[in-house]
């Protein structure tokens, strides 16, 4: 199985996610699993390439002012500015709960 690197920089020399998805679409790839940190998740949501979100909730509390968030960026001031999600599936997997939503 071969591997190919696709280089899709934007004007800031970061990954142009829309361009990357268009390139993958031209190759017959219509979906990917984007598993990243808060910065990548924020970028993908902002450019509109996210169609589904899956979140896992474990029976643990971490807390802390410097705790990581699944979506970094500047956030929103009002609930009406938030990205709207629609539940499609909630299930228990072992001790965890998986929440699947459409964007």
Please report, for each region that a protein language model flagged, where it lies by residue.
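Enzymes that bind and transform nitrogen-containing heteroaromatic metabolites
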Residues: 1-103
């Amino acid at each position: 199985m071969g591997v190919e690197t696709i280089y899709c920089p934007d004007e800031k020399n970061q990954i142009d996610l829309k361009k990357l998805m268009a390139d993958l679409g031209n190759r017959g790839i219509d979906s990917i699993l984007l598993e990243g940190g808060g910065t990548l998740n924020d970028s993908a949501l902002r450019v509109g390439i996210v169609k589904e979100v899956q979140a896992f909730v474990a029976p643990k509390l971490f807390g802390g002012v410097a705790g990581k968030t699944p979506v970094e960026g500047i956030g929103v001031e009002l609930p009406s500015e938030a990205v709207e999600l629609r539940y499609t599936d909630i299930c228990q997997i072992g001790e965890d709960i998986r929440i699947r939503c459409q964007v």
